[in-house]
């Protein structure tokens, strides 16, 4: 994380909100742990995380791994948000998928 923050600052960027990809919860846990452990002060400030998956449409996955695509899962999101120390600021979801509108209303 520090290498990313340093690189971005060297290009004039002072705040970052990096994106995850569509991974298993286990891998996302590791990403959230790294983000939570990061200390701002040198390089660009980590101001949030954009969770790009896994709550995306299986029909429009782009570069994401279809193996990990799933419906919006509020319990999983809460676990990841707790691990990140509240850093998840954006969550990409597929609005046409079952359960997504409830997820949006609740979060």
Q: Where do the PLM segments sit?
A:
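N-terminal glycine-/serine-/threonine-rich phosphate-binding loop
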Residues: 1-6, 102-106
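A short acidic, helix-capping loop that chelates divalent metal ions and anchors anionic groups
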Residues: 57-65
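Short, small-residue-enriched loops and turns at beta-alpha junctions
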Residues: 24-25, 64-69, 97-98
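Divalent metal-dependent hydrolysis catalytic cores, especially in the metallo-beta-lactamase
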Residues: 2-28, 45-57, 84-96
């Amino acid at each position: 994380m520090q290498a990313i923050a340093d690189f971005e600052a060297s290009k004039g960027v002072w705040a970052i909100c990096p994106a995850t990809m569509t991974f298993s919860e286990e891998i996302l846990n590791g990403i959230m742990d790294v983000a939570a452990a990061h200390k701002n002060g040198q390089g660009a400030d980590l101001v949030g995380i954009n969770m790009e998956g896994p709550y995306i449409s299986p029909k429009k996955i782009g570069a994401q791994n279809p193996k990990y695509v799933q419906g919006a899962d509020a319990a999983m999101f809460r676990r990841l948000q707790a691990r990140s120390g509240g850093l998840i600021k954006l969550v990409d979801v597929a609005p046409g998928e079952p359960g997504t509108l409830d997820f949006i209303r609740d979060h």
